[in-house]
Amino acid sequence: MKMSLAEKVYLKLREVPRGKVTTYKWLAEVAGSKGYRLVGQILKRNPDAPRTPCHRVVSSSGKIGGFGGERSGKKIEEKIRMLEQEGVEVKKGVIDLEQYGFDFKE
């Protein structure tokens, strides 16, 4: 049975370890899509958080991105708190992808 893009996204996202983040673009590519914005929409409907850790997905610039369908406010504060609890350093809403990025090639 062929997996949907959403199923592929959720499956691949579970590979991102604690203390690392991936980007919408990297996640889209490894799931076989060019639609990184679509990945964001898929993650907004994540039925299995935190087992499927959508808080570990950020923008390609390292900016924190959205969370739970929001781009600011309490949800973003929660995302930052979750990442920091896992050892990811967030400076002014930005994460150093050189240090914390997981591009699925490791």
What does each of the following model-derived ranges do?
Residues 1-106:
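Nucleic acid-binding interface residues in structured DNA/RNA-binding domains
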